[in-house]
Amino acid sequence: MTKSNSSDSKKARAMLALTRFVVYLILIFLSALCLFSFYMLIVNASRTNADLQSGFKLLPQGSFMANLKNAWNDSSINIPRGLLNSFFVAGCTAVLTTYFSALTAYGIHAYNFKLKNAAFTFIMAVMVIPKQVSATGFVQLCYKYHLTNSYLPLILPGIATPVVFFYMKQYMESVLPMEIVDAARVDGSGEFHTFNRIVLPMLKPALAVQLIFSFVESWNNYFLPALLLDKAEMKTVPIMIAQLRAADYSKF
């Protein structure tokens, strides 16, 4: 019996080691693919337009600094200002989106009211509606209230993000026991104090993930800024990249 148990234990350890090896191998392969994308980004940045049209190459060329200088000194765009604008918009959007989505998820999770399920269903239904569907009305509203060439229409709508709300609610259901919230209420803690001092620290992993995702999504947003921002000093990086694509490629 002892020999049989020892044999089974060795087989289990061998299977565990094999499983870990396969998992690590897959992760290394996926990481290499991601790093290869960044590598090709640098390689293509070091090539001229004629080189890019000639075909695929793995080795960097010698035009990286010239391309960077041409893009940085291009009179039609202001890259430092564009980076600052994008950081401001994306940073504000990420912080506000994550906080208020977590607050909304807490309200749905912690309170029982008649229309709780209806409210959750409505928020989920909004998630399937493409933003392009309501873009015309939204842009007309911005023009009516003179909100063009302003970052408010880019930041405020992003606060109501059903995807982030859904993620935060599901995370709360797995890590936030209501007994902790009830104990805080018994001790006299207000709802906002409970949320900010007790609930949010328990959501740090989810908050970090959603901050990153929201920041990247806002940073890559081209659709609304292209419709609402006309002044050159207010344009974000995606708009400037589009301008570079439409510019004279012989310089790059």
Residue ranges and their predicted role:
Residues 1-15:
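Short, Lys/Arg-rich, polar N-terminal cytosolic tail immediately upstream
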Residues 11-15, 19-252:
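A structural signal for multi-pass alpha-helical bundles of membrane permease subunits
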